[in-house]
């Protein structure tokens, strides 16, 4: 009985370790509008999302394109780094979040093609930087009790 209990405990702990890993994706949500500001309702659109290093015009550290469908309010949701993207450059876990500011550039083709229009670039804030915390376990610190 003790062996079965020990085995079940080990399996549970190993399973918990697997779930504690960062997923390597970023959520992004927006409302799609046409050139005069009208919401694109229930429409197939294409997005190109780019993460840039240091400045809004900085080096590309990640890029992907996606075909998405807006909802009745023009809202769309994507997960950068998840399956289903095309034209992918880099990986989300491969971005060096520890060095410098990161910016996300959003481009859209309201017709669902590949004629992208740049609709803006914004600096990323705290949450994506938490991906850097996944490497904190790699630190080796001397512990001297003196």
Predicted region positions:
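Family-positioned intrinsically disordered, low-complexity linker/tail segments enriched in G/S/T/P
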Residues: 3-145
């Amino acid at each position: 009985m003790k062996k079965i209990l020990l085995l079940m405990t080990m399996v549970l702990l190993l399973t918990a370790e697997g779930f504690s890993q960062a997923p390597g994706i970023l959520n992004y949500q927006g409302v799609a509008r046409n050139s005069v500001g009208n919401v694109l309702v229930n429409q197939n659109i294409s997005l190109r999302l780019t993460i840039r290093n240091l400045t809004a015009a900085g080096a590309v550290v990640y890029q992907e394109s996606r075909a998405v469908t807006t909802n009745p309010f023009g809202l769309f949701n994507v997960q950068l780094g998840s399956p289903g993207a095309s034209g992918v450059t880099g990986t989300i876990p491969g971005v060096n979040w520890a060095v410098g500011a990161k910016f996300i550039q959003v481009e859209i083709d309201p017709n669902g093609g590949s004629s992208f229009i740049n609709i803006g670039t914004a600096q990323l804030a705290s949450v994506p930087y938490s991906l850097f915390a996944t490497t904190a376990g790699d630190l080796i610190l001397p512990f001297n009790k003196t």
